[in-house]
Amino acid sequence: MAKLNTKLRGCSQESSVSSLLASGSLSGSRSDSAHSAHSSFVYKDQLYSSASEALQAYIDDFDLSREHPGANAVKVNTDGEIGNGLQFSSYVHIPDNAFVNLDPKQHFNPLYYRRETVNDMDAISLTTDDLLRLPADGCFSFPCVPPDHRPNKKYSGRQDSSDIKNSPSFYVDATSKSKNNIVPPYVYTNINGKKCGRPRTPKPINRENKCVSESSLSFPKESSFTEDSAERRLENYPRWLTSQKSDLSVSGVTSIPDVKYPIWLHNQDLLPEANTPRGYKLLNEDEYRPIHSYQTQRANQLLNKIDCFEYTFKPSNLTDSFSEYEGLGNEFKCQCDNPLLPGQSQKPFCGDKIELLILKAKKNLKQSAKDLPKPVEKDDSPCSLDKLEAERTWENVPVAFKSPVPVKADDSPQQSSRTQCVNAFLEDFLNGENQSSTLSGGKHHGPVEALKQMLFNLQTVQESFNKNKTTEPEEEIKQVSEDDLAKLQMKENMMPITRSLHKALQHLSRLRDLVDDTSGRQSPKK
């Protein structure tokens, strides 16, 4: 049977993992089934059936040594007993008599215990399990964890009931339902928060009887202060966590007390008081409900004690020595009123509280109406509807209509476009002759007008040739007579024919002559 007797320290990073795996491979490679069935591994005096379990234990120990460098090595025996070890890396152990000689007023300050238990909060590296073990108010648990107790992952949840009862690391955590005349029984829980053991028999307290013994009035005693401070500490939930639980959208959180009313009801003194008969009746009705939050049960228990203290302070024949106790009682009551901020199971709207609520609502409405700005008169700032319904001058643009032009209907037949253009050209030409052309003035036609004039001149010349062709025979047309030249000279006086036109006409006449000569010479040869 292969055994690996290695003692690993908490902070040692030079552990022989290879030797551990080698021993496991040797034991697992044996062909004999009897030897392989009985093979086991020993790591820190703990037997493991396989090498994987031993390796996992080594990994867990190594991770723990890195998270808590100051922690000692944990030695787990085969019988499940837990050896020496610290719960936290920077946790300071406090003896049982550490809270004997303390100022009573310091018990209400959770920061006092925080300074006592841990010197430097930033130096602590807590895991998720450690954070879950802390109470709701953020300070460490009142009965500290002894140094010889640290649960192992392998044997967590396997402790016997005898070990749980004998373990000194248990404290009072929660209570069950209780009536007005019975103190809620205590339930023993371990450090993991699991309930175990049997509850203590309830101790009867008569609420109606106002006589209190001297033992109950021994206010400065250490036991009463430690008990009250422990109860006060367990009830100190933050307001952001208890005021609006429905808004958190957290389904798995069950330790947060259910809150039905906001905090402003308590600030406005709208919650029912337990001293009034109606409030006492409501408390009785609420406590018989099947589901009751932990905070309500603690508050009812504290109210029973407060009523006893208040009755003892009321007689006027008491000496001045009780004035300090009365001040402490009032302070204790004020602090005990804090858990009742939401008013978990109490009905706030009862009796005269409804009238007070209505009056305060009316007052708030009046104040809000006064704070509103006054409506502005129409003269200063017109309403938007008036602006929208008004006429839009930019849309009604005046349209300028032109006067109708009369159409001249003449009975005479219309002339052709050519004759009209020629007449207009002649009129312009005659008007232009009357005007003296000077270097500085005078009408000068543009290029477009000049082209038009040239076109008109060519058209007139073409018309004249066409007329001559129709009236005279071809032979007479070929020979230019003197009469035609005289007519052309007359037309030159009437129309401004340019030199180019003259040259063009001359070239045309010569070309015709040449054509006629060539045609006449070729005809007799044929």
Swiss-Prot record:
InterPro entries: Cell_Prolif_Regulator (IPR052679), LAS2 (IPR031587). GO terms for cellular component: extracellular region. It comes from the Eukaryota. Keywords: Phosphoprotein, Secreted, Signal. Residues 150-170 are annotated as: Disordered. It is found in: Secreted. Widely expressed with highest levels in lung and spleen. Also expressed during embryonic development, at least from 7 to 17 dpc. The keyword rRNA-binding does not apply. The modification Phosphoserine is found at S161. Might play a role in cell proliferation. This is Lung adenoma susceptibility protein 2.
